[in-house]
A protein has these predicted regions:
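Start-of-domain marker
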Residues: 3-70, 255-262, 280-318
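A short beta-strand motif characteristic of beta-propeller blades
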Residues: 6-14, 57-65, 110-118, 157-165, ...
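Repeated scaffold domains used in trafficking and secretory/extracellular systems
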Residues: 15-25, 67-78, 117-130, 167-177, ...
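Post-signal peptide N-terminal segment of secreted/secretory-pathway proteins
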Residues: 17-147
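Short beta-strand elements that form the blades of beta-propeller/WD-repeat-like
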Residues: 24, 28-43, 80-94, 131-142, ...
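Beta-propeller blade signature
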Residues: 47-55, 98-108, 148-154, 196-209, ...
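Solenoidal tandem-repeat scaffolds enriched in leucines and small polar residues
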Residues: 126-240
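Conserved blade-ending motifs and adjacent loop-strand segments that build the rim/top face
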Residues: 213-225, 277-320, 393-410, 437-470
Length: 502
C-alpha cells in the first residue's frame, strides 16, 4: 500500500495566476525547485529562486538568478552531472525571432551558468532533451521543415543538425534514450500537404545519425503519438497510436500540439536489417474495451451489437479515443503502453435577442460553451518482445474537469507490481496489477497529510505525480489551504509531497 512520509512536504507561496513553479527530480540526490518570485533587481530583471532539496524535502540551498522579465518556464531536463532549465519570451511579436534563455546547473561542482539563444523568425520550439552534457532542442519552422540545435555544455559549443528528408516535413517527437546515450527523432513527411509517412532517426550523443527508417502510412490511417524503445539487439521499436487521417490537405502549424485526432488502435513497429515488422491492434477488436469508454459510447456499442445480432448491421463500427501523450513502462520483461483518454465537455446556452433597438420580435440565439476536459479513463496494453498483445485493461479515476491538458495519472513498477495512481482533491487514488494484468487491489483512496495538523483542504489545481527514486514518488500541484490557527487563515501554495509504496 502507499504510505506517506511524515513532514516530507515542501511549500512555496503562490502570488499570481501566471507564476511559474517547477520541480526537477535528481533521484536519490533529491531535486531542485524553480520558483518565479515577485522580486526584480535594479535592471528590472525578474529574480528566479532555485532551491536545492534533499530526499526528505529539506532545503539545502537557495539561489536567486536574474532573468529578463516576462519569461515563461518551458521545460527542464537533468542528467547525472547536469540540469538545464529553459525559459521563453512568449510575449514577443509574431514576426520576431524566438529568443530563449537557459539556466544550466553543474551538479558536480554545484555551479550555475546562463546562456541565451535566438531561433529563426516565426519558428516553434517543440521540445528539449539532455544526455550527459549534450543538450538538444527540436525546432519547427512555421511553414514546415525543422532542425535540431545541439549544445555542448562542457565545451560551450553549438551546431545545427537538419534531418535529410526530401519532401516537406515537420519534427513531431524527439526523445532522449539515456541507457544507450542516443536521441530518437520522429518526423512527419508530407507530399502535396498530405501526411504520407513517418521518418525515424537515431542520433548518437554527438549528433551522428546511426539509424534511419521510414514507415509508410496505411489507407486513411497514420501514426500518432508514440513511445520508443530498443530491444536486446538494439533494434528500434516504436509503440504508436493509430490515427484516422482524411484525404484533405493539412497545415503543419500547430500540428505537434494537436491532441484532437481520433485514435482507433495501437501499432507496434520494429525496424530490423531483414525488414520492418508491424502489428496493429484496433480497439473495436479488443474484448472488454467498452469498460474504458464513456457511458454514452458504451451505450452506442451495445446498440451496434444488438443490430448485428438482428442482422441489421454487418460490421462493427470504430471505437475511438482522444489520447494525451502516451507513456511506456517496463514491467516483468514486457512493455506496457499507457495512454490517458479524455474528451472535451461542452454545454449549450440559449438567450433571447431583441434586435439592435429592442423593438423587434424576440428570437432565440443558441451558442456552445466549453466546460473543460474530462480525463475519464486510462488504458494499458502490454506487449512481448515480438509485438504480441498479452493483456490489456483500463483504470477509471473520477477527475474534475480541467481547462488545459496535462497528465493526471502515473504508472510505475514497485515490488514486482504495477502501480497506477492519480492524485486529486488532496487524496491519492491507486490500483495495483500483477504481471498477468490481474488486479491485486481494488481502487484505494488515501488521504494525504498537510504541512500543519490544523490545515484543511479548500481547492487544488494541476495535481500530478511521478516516480522519484526507489519506491518513492512525488505528488505536486497547487493548493488553496485553510488554517484558522495561523495569522493568514487561507494560503495558496505550490507544493511537493513525498509518498512511498510499501
Amino acid at each position: 500500500m502507499a504510505q506517506q512520509v511524515e513532514t516530507a512536504r515542501y511549500e512555496v507561496p503562490r502570488w499570481g495566476k501566471s507564476q511559474s513553479c517547477h520541480f526537477e527530480p535528481f533521484g536519490e540526490q533529491g531535486g531542485m525547485m524553480v520558483v518565479e518570485t515577485e522580486k526584480t533587481n535594479e535592471e528590472k530583471q525578474r529574480l528566479w529562486e532555485f532551491v536545492t532539496l534533499d530526499t526528505s524535502l529539506y532545503q539545502l540551498r537557495s539561489d536567486l538568478i536574474p532573468l529578463p522579465d516576462k519569461l515563461t518556464f518551458f521545460d527542464s531536463k537533468s542528467s547525472p552531472h547536469w540540469a538545464v532549465f529553459l525559459f521563453l519570451n512568449e510575449k514577443q511579436q509574431r514576426s520576431d525571432s524566438v529568443v530563449f534563455w537557459a539556466v544550466t546547473y553543474n551538479r558536480s561542482v554545484e555551479e550555475y551558468s546562463t546562456f541565451t539563444g535566438r531561433l529563426p523568425e516565426r519558428s516553434i520550439l517543440q521540445s528539449m532533451a539532455l544526455i550527459d552534457g549534450t543538450l538538444m532542442l527540436s525546432v519547427n519552422n512555421k511553414g514546415g521543415g525543422g532542425f535540431l540545435s545541439q549544445y555542448d555544455l562542457n565545451h560551450q559549443r553549438q551546431r545545427t543538425i537538419t534531418p535529410n528528408i526530401g519532401n516537406d516535413f515537420i519534427l513531431f517527437q524527439f526523445e532522449a534514450m539515456p541507457a544507450s546515450k542516443e536521441f530518437v527523432l520522429a518526423a512527419r513527411e508530407f507530399v502535396d500537404k498530405h501526411y504520407k509517412a513517418t521518418r525515424f532517426f537515431v542520433y548518437s550523443h554527438d549528433g551522428r545519425v546511426v539509424q534511419s527508417h521510414r514507415f509508410e502510412n496505411g489507407e486513411n490511417a497514420g501514426l500518432g503519438r508514440m513511445c520508443f524503445a530498443f530491444d536486446t539487439l538494439h533494434r528500434l521499436t516504436v509503440y504508436a497510436t493509430l490515427e484516422r487521417e482524411s484525404n484533405r490537405k493539412v497545415t503543419v502549424e500547430g500540428m505537434t500540439a494537436d491532441f484532437s485526432k481520433e485514435v482507433v488502435g495501437v501499432t507496434w513497429i520494429r525496424f530490423a536489417a531483414e525488414g520492418t515488422q508491424a502489428k496493429t491492434y484496433l480497439f473495436k477488436n479488443l474484448p472488454d474495451i467498452d469498460r474504458a469508454l464513456t457511458s454514452s459510447d458504451r451505450l452506442r456499442v451495445k446498440e451496434e451489437l444488438l443490430k448485428m445480432q438482428q442482422g441489421k448491421k454487418k460490421e462493427k463500427g470504430e471505437i475511438t479515443f482522444q489520447f494525451y501523450a502516451p507513456r511506456l513502462v517496463d514491467f516483468a520483461g514486457h512493455h506496457v503502453f499507457v495512454a490517458e483518454a479524455f474528451q472535451p465537455i461542452y454545454h449549450t446556452e440559449t438567450r433571447m435577442d431583441y434586435g439592435y433597438y429592442g423593438i423587434y420580435r424576440s428570437y432565440p440565439v443558441t451558442y456552445t460553451v466549453f466546460d473543460g476536459y474530462d480525463f475519464f479513463s486510462e488504458i494499458l496494453l502490454t506487449f512481448d518482445d515480438d509485438g504480441e498483445l498479452l493483456w490489456h485493461t483500463s483504470v477509471r479515476f473520477e477527475n474534475a474537469l480541467c481547462d488545459r491538458l496535462w497528465a493526471h495519472a502515473y504508472e510505475a513498477v514497485a515490488h514486482d507490481e504495477l502501480l497506477v495512481a492519480s492524485p486529486g482533491e488532496h487524496t491519492l487514488r491507486y490500483e495495483v496489477f500483477d504481471a498477468d494484468g490481474v488486479q491485486l487491489l481494488n481502487q484505494q483512496v488515501m488521504p494525504m497529510d498537510f504541512m500543519y495538523g490544523t490545515d484543511s483542504y479548500d481547492d487544488e489545481y494541476d495535481a500530478g505525480l511521478y516516480r522519484w527514486y526507489g519506491n518513492s514518488f512525488l505528488v505536486h500541484g497547487c493548493q488553496r489551504v485553510q488554517n484558522p490557527k495561523l495569522r493568514n487563515t487561507r494560503r495558496t501554495v505550490f507544493y511537493v509531497q513525498k509518498i512511498q509504496y510499501e
